[in-house]
Curated annotation (Swiss-Prot):
GO terms for cellular component: nucleus; Rad6-Rad18 complex. This is Postreplication repair E3 ubiquitin-protein ligase rad18. Pathway: Protein modification; protein ubiquitination. Residues 359-373 have a biased composition (Polar residues). PANTHER family: E3 UBIQUITIN-PROTEIN LIGASE RAD18.
């Protein structure tokens, strides 16, 4: 058997005569989850969201999803007026939508089916009007008397019974004839000797009226009266792994997994718990643990590690100056290694790149071609020169060295052989 899911949406009103209700319903929905407000809270920038939705956004970005202004969870306040408005609209929505759809269907049916018969009926009524008025004018006395008797409503007098008012349940007690105080039969005569005639109190505690409260009911009453306390935000960089695991264990949530997963789990539990504190009917801890387990199966354990690393750089409390100071030595080491590799590439590629013009120059200067190295001025020029895109360092070093060594090679070639 197939199941059909009817998801309420603000577009349900567009095909009905009450199409103007659509923007009203849209204003009662959260801009994050697109559902009706659940425990609505208002931000410092006067925007309203679900408590859980805005807490998740602030814990991730620290900005309002509507206007992108900075905000904090401590500034959130509950919006009871919107909560009552949403509840009233949700209760009235099914009947309103049903009436609107019936009106739309009747309008379509009335325009094409019952339009002609209605016009005929009006004509017939107009033709039969005089006859009907004439027949109504001739009436006998019996008909008029019968009509008057039918028109007058029948009034039935209610019989009041004094015994019903004075009925008192039998509890084995007798009332004092002077003050009306109820007591046992054998205590009436002793009471008459000392009775002052004062009326009995309205609410008198009898012997069986005081019922002891069970421990379970007393405990449940204390729980309902005392609101749950909110969880404070913590700085995870100040906590070690074992301390963070102990904190999760004290809260009653799982403490397994790597450190990034522990942080995400604690943040989600903090959002669930604090959002539950904003509700008029808070959920139990078991229900919150079930929601955390659903989040664990869908998002928590399956988040990519790269996303966590990007979030740590993009989070609102990221300190760039402290980051550069902590990793400054590593940056210097990487720069020094890059310069060493650059010099090594220049030394290994330049001797092979110098071509021999002819056999005489190669034979006359063997040591000059095999032991050639980068001159100091070439190295300095390479360090200050900007390398164009697509050009290797070896090519630039070859060109610079060829320019400097060209006069020496020309002298060797032009010198006469011995």
């Amino acid at each position: 058997m197939e199941q059909t899911f009817d998801l309420p949406d603000s577009t349900d009103w567009l095909e009905t005569p009450l199409s103007l209700v659509s923007p009203l319903e849209s204003s009662l929905r959260c801009q994050v989850c697109k559902d009706f407000f659940d425990n609505p809270v208002i931000t410092s920038c006067s925007h309203t969201f679900c408590s859980l939705c805005i807490r998740r956004c602030l814990s991730t970005e620290g900005k309002c999803p509507a206007c992108r202004s900075s905000d904090q969870e401590l500034k959130l306040r509950r919006n009871w007026a919107v909560q009552e408005l949403v509840e009233a609209f949700q209760n009235a929505r099914p009947s309103m939508l049903e009436l609107a759809r019936k009106a739309a269907n009747s309008r379509l049916d009335g325009g094409y089916v019952t339009g002609q018969p209605a016009a005929k009926k009006r004509k017939v009524d107009q033709e039969d009007g005089p006859d009907a008025s004439g027949s109504e004018g001739i009436r006998t006395r019996s008909q008029s008397r019968r009509g008057n008797s039918q028109a007058e409503p029948v009034v039935v007098d209610a019989i009041e019974d004094d015994q019903d008012k004075e009925y008192i349940p039998e509890d084995g007690l007798v009332a004092c004839p002077i003050c009306g105080r109820r007591m046992k039969n054998e205590a009436v005569f002793q009471h008459l000797d000392i009775c002052t005639g004062d009326p009995a109190p309205l609410k008198q505690a009898s012997f069986g009226s005081l019922q002891p409260m069970s421990p379970a009911s007393r405990k449940s009453k204390d729980v309902t009266d005392k609101p749950p306390e909110r969880l404070p935000t913590i700085n995870y960089s100040l906590l070690k792994d074992n301390v963070l695991r102990k904190k999760l264990k004290d809260l009653g949530i799982p403490n397994w997994g790597p450190r990034p997963l522990l942080q995400r789990r604690h943040t989600e539990w903090m959002n669930l718990w604090n959002a539950n504190c904003d509700s008029k009917a808070p959920k139990s801890k078991r229900e919150l643990l079930h929601e955390l387990a659903v989040w664990e199966r869908t998002q928590g354990g399956h988040a990519a590690p790269s996303s966590e690393s990007s979030n740590t750089v993009m989070r609102k409390d990221f300190d760039a100056a402290a980051w550069s100071n902590n990793h400054g030595d590593e940056f210097k080491r990487l720069i020094a290694n890059a310069r060493k590799r650059k010099d090594a590439v220049i030394r290994t590629t330049i001797p092979q790149a110098a071509p021999a013009r002819d056999g005489t120059s190669t034979a006359s200067a063997p040591e000059q071609s095999t032991e050639m190295s980068t001159p100091p001025e070439v190295a300095e020029r390479l360090q200050t020169q900007t390398v164009p895109e697509g050009t290797s360092v070896a090519t630039i070093a070859e060109n610079e060295t060829g320019t400097i060594q060209t006069p020496n090679i020309t002298q060797v070639v032009s010198s006469p052989p011995e």
